Structure formats: structure tokens, C-alpha cells
């Protein structure tokens, strides 16, 4: 099936009056100018959608006249070639009249109601950034500058390179704030690197934990899962919600919010007690088994049922089914890591793979078959490009602002956790902020972070739009080119590598790679190290080492071909010395083995086992558990709520899901307007209620990213950070929901 959408169709109904009624914050009038396009010849271009938090993801074929995109459709040769509503709406975003098209500088003091934005040239903006960053470096030290990437994730490699050669180890991103990296962190504590993955043709059973791929990844994940079910694979799903994925399960498990760790330990105990573990694998490749066996003893099926609400017989059946493998496991990127004990809860689930020997085996969960210099694209593409070795030096780790706040994260991760930014600004540890796609609403109690930015010596941000809640007290706001207007980055899809063929940016927008590289050349005086500000040359610095080039990949379009630098898949890489950097057999852990008992956690005064900690209990005044940040299939958090009216037509305001019993108890019906009340928020939070069995009784799920009086992040406390990851507790907050009048709320 081919999806094709024209510019005329997607912009229909989005005239000035309609758009003005939908956008929360209009950009300065400067941004309403448009760039004239020349030429009438029609041509075909290729790019990648950046609407999801998975990158690089789905391919887009577009047709343009001159420099105007007139129609988009599936890029059928691309590995991910189906577009969803978010991908289709990117064309509307491209020609949104509120786009930021020129660099803006504040002229009024910070804290003023009107920042006094004026248009300036790129030359002035770059000189201003270089002068201010170098002034902070000279007076306080390079580590007093925080470099940060939010969304899109695409500019992370050059921004990290910028931080490196500016000599600041304080580089963070939204994944080190509150996204998916905590689950990777949990796996690394036991396995040394990320492992959990989806089913393969030889998989007999797969366990999916807290992952609603039917909405988060409908075309890739869910289509593959349906195909696997059709061939007869057994499916275990552990999810607090009754999702479409859970509906497919042979054994659906629905624990109470925050009790996943108890469920995982209950399954571990069944494996041990019934002799379902792979003892030979454990003896050769694992450590800490005796401690695990001893701790698991208390998690009897009856105890687990009482604690989690999952029937004892289902706990036993799930453990037996998983043991009858080969089995794979898919762990959550978003949900469980945001519990109060999230990292340990993920770790407990992950140990099921090692206990049954389903580690990098045929049909089991696998490590990626990447060359050792390659890292997850959003951490820099290659260790060489970002000079990862420098970031990992002890003297650089000691300068990071997360050293005391999240010491385990500090030791394990190359990305800094910036969650203690308000405290670090007050203490003088951070004096300047360089933000690429930054969104201050990502944090709990965002007002604390807005105040922190206000008190900095200097700050700037790049973005597609002017966003007042983030940019109001910045010194500069820079216009970023969108996905149709960018060359970088190239895409890595398994062993395949894709290039792009873009249009020219509107106005004076620059792609983020060009911005970061140009700033790097300006602050260091070394243009060559930053490729003269050229994104394609930066890409070629990696692609040439891989035996290819950007031009070569462009010449292959529309085809996306294998890059031979990426090796063919192998199994049991741990036994062949293909994982460790010293080329010895084993894993990238301190012991060289899978660690049931984490030596790193113990080193920092935490239990070495992923112990279970009971979640906060609901109270009489706050009897409902809030799950904040759930997905919808047509919107990704805050990314598309004010920029693409087409998507707002699908859901124009915040909607919370509530079980019929809870709705009945409160006299609520479908579509009622409600207020959410939290002990941590000074104001109520507005929403509409959806009555559904998607939620179990006693919980409410809400979406993160709405603005104004729909902003859910104000209900999340800036305390109870996960001690293992430093992540906020977004999914264990107790609230109440009450019916609201249609009047304006009172604080």
C-alpha cells in the first residue's frame, strides 16, 4: 500500500484564523515571513521522519516543484517504509506560518514580560555565542557550560563533539533526563550493554514488558508481532494497562502500578525452585547466583499475588512458558524506568534471560552486531567521532554535575544527567546553557528549571518554533531546519545506511549539525576539526572509515543498501571475544560475566541485587495512581501538540483514561471535564476523561506535553529520584480526579 498526501490536502483548513486558534504560543511576527521559491520543474527527494522518539526511523519520499514540497508518500525502498499520521503531518509542520525562520536576540532584561526579540544575522549570533561561552570558560572553567540535546535527537553527535572540544564533560540529552536510556542502563549493570530484543524466526516464546508497540511503533513493532503470532509464537505480556499488545497474549499479566519488581522476582523464584534454569550457562557465564537464590526465596506465588494482584497460577505459568524456549524479551523504554524503583525493576525482569540461557542464542535475545567503534546513533554514531574515551576519563567524570546526584549513572554513562540543574545553577556549578531542541517542560516542576535558565549568565537554544515556556529567558533563539531540509544525519538501519536528498531550508534556517559545527569552529578556532561547518563532510568523516561516502549513498537512492563495514549477524558473541574491548571472551562488566549481583551498584552503597521496593501507597485524599507520559498513536509527547493542527484535530486537548468503576465512583461519564489534583502541585490540571478498561481500577493514565493548565509535569515532585539512574518518578504519583465546572479554574 502506498500513502500519498499533497501539500494542498494537508494544509487545507489551516488558514491564518484556524491556525491562530490552535497554537498555544505564536512565534514573533518575524517568523511569518516565507521564502520565495524559484523554478517549476518537479523532482523527487528523500528524507527521514523525526516525529517519533525512535531515530532514525521511517523514510519519506517527497515530490517538490522548485524548492517547494508538494506531495509526500511512503519511501517504499526504505527498511521502515510506512507513514503514520505523525509522518504525514510533518508536511504541515514544514509550512506552518509560525515557524522560526531567523536568529532572534533578546533586548530586554531577563524576567521581563516582553523579551524584546529582534532579528539578527547568523554572523552576529555565532560571534555572540562564541564570546559568551569562552568568557564563561575563561572565568569559571569549561565544565560550567551545559550542552544539551532534546528533540529531535538527530544533532546529538555534533553537539557532543562540540562539548568535547570545548572541553566540557557536561553534555546531556532528553534520554539522560527521562526517556529510554534508564532501561539500557539497567541492562548494562548486569550484561555490560543493551541486549533485550524482539523475536526472530526461531523464537518460541517472547515476553513483552510495559511496551505498547501497537501505538508507539505501529508499523514496525506491531506488524512484526502480528506476523510472529500468526506462525504460532507464545506471548507473555506484563503491562499495567490492557493494551492491544496485551490482548494478543497467551498469558497476560497486569500487575498493580509500581509492583513489577515483585512479579519479576516471583518468576525468578519459580525458575529456581522448579529447576528450570540453565545451570551450565549460569556456572560458566554468570556471577552472584547464590545471592539471587537466597533473595528470591520470599517471593512465593502467594506473596506475589497479594503484592501485585497477578494470580499465583499465572506467575507460575508465565515462568514455565518462558523457560520452554528459546525465548526473547522486550523491555520497556519509557514506562517502568519512571517508577520509583524503576531501574531495579527492569534489571529484575532482565535476569530472566540469563537464568534460562536465552542470551545471544538462536531464538533468544541478542546483542547488536555492531562494530566496536559504533555506538547507538543518538550517543554519537562512533566513539571516534565524539572521542568517547575523553568523556570516560576519571578527571572528566569528576567535573560532571551528576557526580553526587547520580553516582552510578555518572560512572556508567557517557551522557551527563542534568536533572539537578536548578541546584547546580544555584551553587554556581553551571553558568551557561547551550540547548538544541530543548524543552523545559520535560522536567518535573518545570518552573524550577525555568528559574534556573533565568539565572544563568548566558543561554541559547535552537528550535523549529519559538516556545515561550522554554525560550522566554534565553539570550538567543536560533532557527533550525526541519527533516525535509537536512542532509545530516545519515540513517543506520541494521546493516543498511541511507542518505537524504533535501530541499533548501526556508528563511535563514540552518540544520542543527551546521549550527553545532559552526559554533565549534568559532569557540575553538579550529575550523578543520569541525569540517568547516559542513554537515556532509562531518558525515563523510565516519562514512569514509566505513568504506562508503555520503555521495555514494545518495547515488543509490531510492535504494537503501547494506554497508559492508557492518558485519553479518553472529550468535554467542560473548564466547568469541566479540563484545569486550580487550577481545577476550565474556561481557563488558567489571567481572567479565553477567552480574546478577551488580558490583557497580554495591560499590556505590546500593544493594547489588535488583531488590524490590514497595511503591507509594494511595491515600484517602489521593487514591489514584497517575501514570504520566503514556503514548497515543498519533502524537508523541509535546512534539506535535502546537505545531501540526492536523494532529490536534484528532485530539485537541488533554484526555486521561480512567476505569469505569473509578469514573462511576466520582459521578463521571465519557467526555466530562475534570481536574487532576496532586499534593505536589499548587494548581489543578485540566483534562477530559475517557472511560475505558484500558486502565485497571485505581489508576489514571495521562499524556505528558500539554501546556498551560493541562501541563501534567507540575504534579510530579522533584524528589524520589531513582538512585540507580537519577530518573524522575513519573509513574508512581498519587492523585485525585474531580469533576470540574466549565468555569475558569481557581488555583
Indicate residue ranges for each PLM-predicted region.
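Extended redox/cofactor-interaction regions of prokaryotic respiratory oxidoreductases
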Residues: 157-238, 261-265, 351-473, 481-489, ...
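Conserved short loop/turn motifs at secondary-structure junctions
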Residues: 145-153, 306-310, 333-340, 372-373, ...
Amino acid at each position: 500500500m502506498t500513502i500519498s498526501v499533497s501539500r494542498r490536502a494537508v494544509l487545507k483548513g489551516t488558514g491564518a484564523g484556524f491556525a491562530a486558534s490552535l497554537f498555544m504560543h505564536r512565534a514573533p511576527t518575524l517568523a511569518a515571513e516565507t521564502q520565495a521559491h524559484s523554478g517549476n520543474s518537479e523532482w523527487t527527494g528523500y528524507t527521514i521522519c523525526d516525529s517519533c522518539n525512535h531515530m532514525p526511523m521511517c523514510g519519506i519520499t517527497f515530490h517538490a516543484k522548485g524548492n517547494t514540497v508538494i506531495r509526500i508518500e511512503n519511501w517504499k525502498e526504505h527498511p521502515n517504509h510506512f507513514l503514520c499520521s505523525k509522518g504525514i503531518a510533518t508536511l504541515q509542520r514544514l509550512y506552518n506560518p509560525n515557524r522560526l525562520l531567523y536568529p532572534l536576540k533578546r533586548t530586554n532584561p531577563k524576567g521581563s514580560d516582553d523579551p524584546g526579540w529582534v532579528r539578527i544575522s547568523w554572523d552576529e549570533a555565532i560571534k555572540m555565542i562564541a564570546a559568551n561561552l569562552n568568557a564563561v570558560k575563561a572565568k569559571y572553567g569549561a565544565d560550567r557550560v551545559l550542552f544539551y540535546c532534546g528533540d529531535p535527537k538527530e544533532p546529538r553527535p555534533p553537539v557532543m563533539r562540540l562539548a568535547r572540544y570545548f572541553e566540557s564533560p557536561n553534555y546531556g540529552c532528553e534520554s539522560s533526563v527521562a526517556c529510554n536510556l534508564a532501561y539500557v542502563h539497567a541492562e548494562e549493570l548486569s550484561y555490560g550493554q543493551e541486549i533485550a530484543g524482539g523475536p526472530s524466526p526461531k523464537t518460541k516464546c517472547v515476553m513483552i514488558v510495559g511496551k505498547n508497540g501497537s501505538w508507539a511503533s505501529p508499523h514496525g513493532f506491531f506488524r512484526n508481532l502480528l506476523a510472529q503470532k500468526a506462525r504460532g509464537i507464545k506471548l507473555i505480556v506484563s503491562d499495567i494497562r490492557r493494551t492491544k499488545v496485551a490482548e494478543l497474549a497467551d498469558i497476560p499479566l497486569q500487575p498493580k502500578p509500581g509492583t513489577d519488581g515483585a512479579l519479576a522476582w516471583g518468576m525468578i523464584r519459580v525458575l529456581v525452585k522448579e529447576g528450570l534454569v540453565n545451570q551450565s550457562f549460569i556456572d560458566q557465564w554468570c556471577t552472584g547466583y547464590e545471592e539471587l537464590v537466597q533473595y528470591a526465596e520470599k517471593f512465593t506465588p502467594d506473596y506475589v499475588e497479594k503484592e501485585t494482584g497477578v494470580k499465583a497460577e499465572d506467575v507460575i505459568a508465565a515462568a514455565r512458558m518462558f523457560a520452554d524456549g528459546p525465548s526473547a524479551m522486550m523491555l520497556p523504554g519509557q514506562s517502568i524506568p519512571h517508577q520509583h524503583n524503576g531501574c531495579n525493576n527492569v534489571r529484575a525482569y532482565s535476569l530472566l534471560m540469563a537464568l534460562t540461557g536465552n542470551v545471544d542464542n538462536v531464538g533468544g535475545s541478542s546483542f547488536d552486531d555492531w562494530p566496536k567503534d559504533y555506538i547507538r546513533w543518538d550517543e554519537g554514531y562512533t566513539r571516534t567521532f565524539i572521542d568517547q574515551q575523553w568523556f570516560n576519563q576519571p578527571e572528566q567524570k569528576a567535573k560532571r554535575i551528576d557526580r553526587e546526584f547520580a553516582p552510578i549513572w555518572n560512572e556508567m554513562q557517557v551522557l551527563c544527567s542534568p536533572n539537578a540543574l536548578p541546584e547546580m545553577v544555584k551553587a554556581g556549578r553551571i553558568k551557561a546553557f547551550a540547548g538544541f531542541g530543548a524543552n523545559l517542560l520535560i522536567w518535573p516542576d518545570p518552573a524550577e528549571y525555568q528559574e534556573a535558565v533565568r539565572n544563568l549568565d548566558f543561554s541559547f537554544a535552537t528550535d523549529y518554533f519559538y516556545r515561550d515556556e522554554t525560550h522566554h529567558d534565553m539570550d538567543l533563539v536560533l532557527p533550525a531546519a526541519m527533516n525535509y531540509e537536512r542532509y545530516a544525519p545519515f540513517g543506520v538501519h541494521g546493516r543498511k545506511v541511507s542518505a537524504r536528498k533535501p530541499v533548501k531550508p526556508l528563511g535563514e534556517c540552518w540544520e542543527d549539525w551546521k549550527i553545532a559545527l559552526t559554533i565549534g569552529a568559532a569557540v575553538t578556532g579550529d575550523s578543520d576539526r569541525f569540517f568547516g561547518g559542513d554537515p556532509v563532510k562531518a558525515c563523510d568523516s565516519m562514512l569514509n572509515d566505513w568504506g562508503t561516502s555520503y555521495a555514494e549513498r545518495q547515488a543509490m537512492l531510492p535504494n537503501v543498501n547494506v554497508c559492508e563495514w557492518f558485519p553479518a549477524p553472529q550468535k554467542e558473541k560473548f564466547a568469541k571475544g566479540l563484545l569486550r574491548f580487550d577481545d577476550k571472551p565474556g561481557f563488558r562488566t567489571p567481572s567479565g560475566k553477567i552480574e546478577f549481583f551488580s558490583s557497580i551498584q554495591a560499590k556505590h552503597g546500593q544493594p547489588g541485587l535488583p531488590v524490590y521496593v514497595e511503591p507509594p501507597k494511595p491515600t484517602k485524599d489521593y487514591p489514584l495512581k497517575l501514570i504520566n507520559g503514556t503514548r497515543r498513536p498519533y502524537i508523541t509527547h509535546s512534539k506535535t501538540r502546537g505545531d501540526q493542527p492536523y494532529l490536534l484535530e484528532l485530539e485537541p486537548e488533554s484526555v486521561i483514561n480512567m476505569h469505569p468503576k473509578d469514573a462511576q465512583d466520582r459521578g463521571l461519564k465519557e467526555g466530562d471535564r475534570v481536574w487532576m489534583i496532586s499534593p505536589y502541585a499548587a494548581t489543578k490540571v485540566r483534562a477530559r476523561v475517557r472511560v475505558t478498561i484500558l486502565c485497571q481500577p485505581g489508576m489514571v493514565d495521562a499524556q505528558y506535553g500539554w501546556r498551560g493548565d493541562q501541563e501534567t509535569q507540575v504534579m510530579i515532585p522533584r524528589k524520589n529520584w531513582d538512585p540507580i539512574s537519577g530518573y524522575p518518578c513519573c509513574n508512581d504519583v498519587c492523585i485525585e480526579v474531580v469533576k470540574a465546572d466549565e468555569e475558569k479554574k481557581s488555583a
